[in-house]
Amino acid sequence: MPGAPGSLEMGPLTFRDVTIEFSLEEWQCLDTVQQNLYRDVMLENYRNLVFLGMAVFKPDLITCLKQGKEPWNMKRHEMVTKPPVMRSHFTQDLWPDQSTKDSFQEVILRTYARCGHKNLRLRKDCKSANEGKMHKEGYNKLNQCRTATQRKIFQCNKHMKVFHKYSNRNKVRHTKKKTFKCIKCSKSFFMLSCLIRHKRIHIRQNIYKCEERGKAFKSFSTLTKHKIIHTEDKPYKYKKCGNAFKFSSTFTKHKRIHTGETPFRCEECGKAFNQSSNLTDHKRIHTGEKTYKCEECGKAFKGSSNFNAHKVIHTAEKPYKCEDCGKTFNHFSALRKHKIIHTGKKPYKREECGKAFSQSSTLRKHEIIHTGEKPYKCEECGKAFKWSSKLTVHKVVHTGEKPYKCEECGKAFSQFSTLKKHKIIHTGKKPYKCEECGKAFNSSSTLMKHKIIHTGEKPYKCEECGKAFRQSSHLTRHKAIHTGEKPYKCEECGKAFNHFSDLRRHKIIHTGKKPYKCEECGKAFSQSSTLRNHQIIHTGEKPYKCEECGKAFKWSSKLTVHKVIHTGEKPCKCEECGKAFKHFSALRKHKVIHTREKLYKCEECGKAFNNSSILAKHKIIHTGKKPYKCEECGKAFRQSSHLTRHKAIHTGEKPYKCEECGKAFSHFSALRRHKIIHTGKKPYKCEECGKAFSHFSALRRHKIIHTGEKPYKCEECGKAFKWSSKLTVHKVIHTAEKPCKCEECGKSFKHFSALRKHKVIHTREKLYKCEECVKAFNSFSALMKHKVIHTGEKPYKCEECGKAFKWSSKLTVHKVIHTGEKPCKCEECGKAFKHFSALRKHKVIHTGKKPYKCEECGKAFSQSSSLRKHEIIHSGEKPYKCEECGKAFKWLSKLTVHKVIHTAEKPCKCEECGKAFKHFSALRKHKIIHTGKKPYKCEECGKAFNDSSTLMKHKIIHTGKKPYKCAECGKAFKQSSHLTRHKAIHTGEKPYKCEECGKDFNNSSTLKKHKLIHTREKLYKCEECVKAFNNFSALMKHKIIHTGEKPYKCEECGKAFKWSSKLTEHKVIHTGEKPCKCEECDKAFKHFSALRKHKVIHTGKKPYQCDECGKAFNNSSTLTKHKIIHTGEKPYKCEECGKAFSQSSILTKHKIIHSVEKPYKCEECGKAFNQSSHLTRHKTIHTGEKPYKCEECGKAFIQCSYLIRHKTIHTREKPTNVKKVPKLLSNPHTLLDKTIHTGEKPYKCEECAKAF
C-alpha cells in the first residue's frame, strides 16, 4: 500500500525503456534492409508492452514507422502506463515458443504471490484501458514488488536467467542466427545494435568531443565516462580500505577483492571470476576465438579492449601528456600509471613480505610469486606461466611467426615492442640525454640507470657485509648469497637456484631448444640476452672504456671487473684460509677447493667440475666448435678471451709499459708478473728444498717435481703431464692442426711460439751471443743449452747404467731404453713407440703427405728434418770432420758412430758371453740370441719374432694391406721405403753416384751395396755352404735355399714362396690385372719390371755388355745370367736327382718334373700347366692374339721370343755367336748334340706329353 513503511517509490515505465534511438549519422549508416528490420523490431517492442498488459498511448514514433517515415527527426513522447489491467491485443504467433510466453506470465504471477497478492492473475479479456482504473491500488502494489525484486520479471527458459525487461537479444542468442550482416566486411551479428556499433569502425567517425583535451568519441556515453577523468571526483568510497572510485562498476569490482566473491564460473573448467568480462575473456581460451582483427597487420584479438589498445600502435597517436616531465602516452591508463612515479606513492602493500607497489595490478602479479601458481600453460611444450601475456610471448617461439616487419630493412620480429626498439636504430634518435657527460640514450629508463654512474650513489646496502648497490634488484640478488636460500628447484635434475630467472635459464638446458638465431653466422642460443651479447662480436663495438688506462670493453660487467685492477682492493676474504679476492665470484670458486665438491658433471665423459661455467667451457671440447675466428690469420678459438689475447699478436700492440725498465706487454697480467723481477721479492718458498719463487703459481708447479704427480692426462694416448699447459701443447699433436703460418715462406706451425722462433731465420738476427766461442743464437734458451758444451757438465745421470746427459729431456728419452715401455701406439697398424715424437713421424706414412719439397730435384719429404738431411746431398757439404783420420760426414750422428772405430771402445758388453758392442741398440739385439725368446707371436700362423717391429711387418703378409700406393701406375706397397724406391723408376732420377766407376743409383742403399763390388769384400758368410755375401739381407735370403722354407703362401692356389716379392708377382696371375701399359704399342704388363724390359725393344739400346765375349744385353740381370756361361758355375743343385743349374729359377722349373704338380689351370679348356708362363702361352691359342709384330715384313707372333728369332732372318745374325769360349760350340745345333749324350729331354709337348 502507498505510504506503508518500507515502500519504495518508483518512476513510471516509459516507451523509451524499450526503444532504440538513432542520430542522423547513425541512421545513414543503415541500408534499406536494415532500416526495414529496425521498423519491425520497434513495432514488435511496442506490441510486447501491450501484450504484458501495459496500456500505452501510441507514440508518434510508431505512427511514423507504420507510415514508412524516417524516425531520426521525430519528437518522442513519453507515454505513462496505466494500472495493471493486463491485456494482449496480439495473437499467438507473436511468440516463437509457447513455453517462452508462458514462462514470462508465470514469473509475473510468482513474483506477485511472494508479495502477498495471491488474487492477481493475467487477464486476456480487458476490453479497454478504462477498465484498468478499478485496479489502481493493485498496480501500486505490483510496482512496489517489481522494485523489490530488482525489476527482474522476465525469465529465460533455456538458462533460467531473469531480466528486468523483455529481451529479444536473449532470444536471438539461443537461435544462433546472425541475421545482421555488414556490407563492407561481410561480418555477421546477432543484434542490429552490434552491427551499428561495428559500422563505426569503417567510417571512423568520432562526433562526441571532449572540451578539456579535445579527444573525440563515437558515443555520448563514452564521452560522459571520459569527463569524470577531468573532475577528479571519486564519489564511490569503500570503508574497509578507504579506496575511492569514480565509477560504481569499478567500486563493485573492488569490493569483490575483499569479499573474495567470484560469482562468474566457467562451465568448461570450473574456474570462477570476479567479473563477467573476465569470464568472457577466459571462455575464449577454450574456444580459441579471436573476433577482433586488425586491418593494418592482420593480428587478431579475443577482446575489444585489447583490440582498441592495439590500434593505437599503427596511428602512433599519443594524446595523453604528462605535465611533470612531458612524456606522452597512447592511453590514459598508461599516463595514470606513469604519474605515480612522480608522486612516489606505493599504497598497495603485501602483508607477507612487506613489499609495496604503486598499482594494484603490480601487487596482484607479485602475489603469484608467493603462491607459485602458473595457470597459463603452453599446449605445445607444457611450459607454464604466471601471466597470460608471458604465455602469448612464449607461443611465438613455437610458431616462429614474425608479423612485425621493419619497413626500412625488412627485418621481422615476433613482438611489436621489439620492432619499436629496432626502429630506433634507423632513426638514430636518442632523445634522452645525460646532462653530465652528454651521452644520449633511446629510452628514459636507460638514462636513469646511466645517471647513477655519475652520482656514484649506491642507496641499497647489504646489512650482512655492507656491500652497496645501485639498484634494489641487485641487492635482492646479492642477499641470496648470505642466506644460501635456493627456493627455485629444477624438477628435471633437482638443482636449486637463488632466483627464478636463473632457474628459467637452467631449464633450457634440459629442453635443448635454441630459438634465438644469429643472422650473421647462424649460431643459435637458448636466450635472447646471450644472442645480444654474441652479436657484439660481429659489430666489434666496445662502448665501455676504462678512464685509467683507456682499455675498452664490449660489456659493462667486464669493465667493472677490470677497474679492480687499478684499485688493488680485495674485499672478499675466505674464512677458511684468509685468502682475499677482488670479486665474490673468485671467492666462491676458491671455496670449492676446501669442500672438494664437484657438482657439475659432463654427460659425455663423466668429468666433474666445481662450477657450471667450467663445465660449459669443457663441453666445447666434445663438440669441437670454435666460434671465435681471427680475421687476420683465420685461426679459431673456443672462447672470446682467447681470441682477444691472440689478436695482440697481429697488432703488435703493447699498451702496458713497465715504469722501471720501459718494457711493454700485451696484457696487464704479463706486466704484473714482470714487475716482481724489479722488487726481487720471492715470498713463495718450497718446504722440501727451500727454493723461493716470485709467484704462487711457480711454486705450485715446482712442487710437482718432488711429488712426481702428473694429474693432466691425454685422452688420446694416455700420456700424463705435470701442467695443463703442457697437455694443451701436446693435444695439438693429435689434431695435426697448424694454424700459425709464416708470411715469408708459407710454412705452418702448431703454436705461435714455434712460428716466432722460425721468423728469426728470415731476419737472420741472432741477439744471444756466446762469450766463449762468439757463436750467436736466436733465443736465450738455445744459448743456455750451448753453454753446457763448454763446461762439459752433464748433471742428469741415469740410475740404471750411469750414463750422464747435459739436458733432462735427453735423460728422459734414454730411460725408456731400460724400461722397454712403448706407450705410444699407432691406431692404423698397431706399431708401438717409446716416444710420441716417433709415433708422430710414423703417422705421416699412413697419410702419405709430403709437404717438404726439395727445390733442387723436387723430391718431397714428410718431415722438415729429412728435407734438411737430403739437401746436404746436393750441396755436397760435409761439415762434420773426424780429427783422427780427416774423414768428413754430412751428419753429426754419423761422425759419432765413426769415432768409435778409432777408439775401438765398445762400452756396451754382453753379460752372457762377454761380447762387446759400440752401441746399446746392437747389444739389445744381441741379447735376444741368448734368451732364445721370441715374445712377439703372430696370431695367424703362430710364427714368433724377437721384436714387435718385425712382427708388425710380418702381419702385413696376412692382411694383404698395401697402404702405400704409387700415383703414377697405381702399384701398392706394404712399406713406404718400397714406394720411395719404386717412384725413382718413373722419374728416372739417380742422385746417388759411385765415385769409383761413375754409376748412378736411385737410392743410397743400392749405392752402398754397389760399392762392395769394388772392395770385393764379402763379410756375410753362409755356414752351410761357405758362400759369402756383401750384405746381411742377401745372406738371409740365401739361407732360405738351405731351409727350404716358403712362408709366403698364395690364398688362391696354395702355392708357397720364399720371398714376399715373389708372392706379390704371383698374385697378379689370379687377378689378370695389367696396370703397366706401354705408351709406344699399348701393350700391358702385370709388373713394371716387365714393362721396363719391354721398352728396350722400342729403343733398341743394349747398355749391358759382356767383358768376355762382347755381347750386349738390355738389362743387368740378363748379363749376370749370361756371365755364368763363361764361368760354368752351377750353384743350384736338385736334391732329387743331383742335377745342378746356373740359376735358381731354372732349378725351380726343373723341380716340377719330379712333383708332377700342375697348379696353373686354363679356364677355357681345363688343361693344367707346371708354370704360369706355359699357361700364358697356351691362352694365346684360344684368343688367337699375336701381339708381337715384325716391323720389316709385318709378320706377327704369339710370343716375344718367336719375334726375336724371326728377326735374325732379316739380319742374318747367328743368335748364339760366342767368342773366346773353347768349351762351347759356336753353333746352336751343337748344343742339341750334347743332350743326346745326357739323354735329357727337357722339351715336352703340351698336347701329347711327348718329350724331346
Swiss-Prot record:
It is found in: Nucleus. One of its GO terms (biological process) is regulation of transcription by RNA polymerase II. Pfam families: KRAB, zf-C2H2, zf-C2H2_6. The keyword DNA damage does not apply. The keyword Zinc-finger applies. Residues 13-84 form the KRAB domain. PROSITE patterns: KRAB, ZINC_FINGER_C2H2_1, ZINC_FINGER_C2H2_2. Its main location: nucleus. One of its GO terms (molecular function) is zinc ion binding. SMART domains: KRAB (SM00349), ZnF_C2H2 (SM00355). One of its GO terms (cellular component) is nucleus. Keywords: DNA-binding, Metal-binding, Nucleus, Repeat, Transcription, Transcription regulation, Zinc, Zinc-finger. A zinc finger (C2H2-type) spans 180-202, 208-230, 236-258, 264-286, 292-314, 320-342, 348-370, 376-398, 404-426, 432-454, 460-482, 488-510, 516-538, 544-566, 572-594, 600-622, 628-650, 656-678, 684-706, 712-734, 740-762, 768-790, 796-818, 824-846, 852-874, 880-902, 908-930, 936-958, 964-986, 992-1014, 1020-1042, 1048-1070, 1076-1098, 1104-1126, 1132-1154, 1160-1182, 1188-1210. May be involved in transcriptional regulation. Belongs to the krueppel C2H2-type zinc-finger protein family. This is Zinc finger protein 729.
